[in-house]
UniProtKB/Swiss-Prot annotation:
It comes from Arabidopsis thaliana. The keyword Methyltransferase does not apply. Belongs to the DEFL family. Residues 1-24 form the signal peptide. Disulfide bonds join C29-C46, C35-C53. It comes from the Eukaryota. GO terms for biological process: defense response to fungus; killing of cells of another organism. Coiled coil: none annotated. Keywords: Antimicrobial, Disulfide bond, Fungicide, Plant defense, Secreted, Signal. It is found in: Secreted. One of its GO terms (cellular component) is extracellular region. The keyword Cell inner membrane does not apply. This is Defensin-like protein 255.
Length: 80
């Protein structure tokens, strides 16, 4: 019984998160406060040129290379 209720709780929470994301992602807006209410976060703002909410962390993916690579190189360019 405990296992079933835990799985049900996980399923319901996943559905809530997905539905909030899809409903709030492309909202039209006129003020920053509208976007922050939809997102329930502080990083959202209204892009007034497009009249759409920009949620910051949800719209961007950081694909930069790390500053310190895992394989260190010597001054002559060799691996170790």
């Amino acid at each position: 019984m405990r296992s079933i209720s835990f799985k049900l709780l996980l399923l319901v929470s996943l559905l809530v998160v997905v539905s909030r994301y899809t409903l709030a992602y492309e909202d039209s807006c006129s003020t920053d406060e509208e976007c922050r209410r939809n997102c329930l976060c502080d990083v959202a703002y209204c892009d007034k040129s497009r009249d759409k909410c920009d949620y910051g962390f949800m719209n961007r993916v950081d694909v930069r290379f790390p500053k310190h690579p895992y394989i260190s190189k010597n001054k002559d360019g060799s691996g170790r």
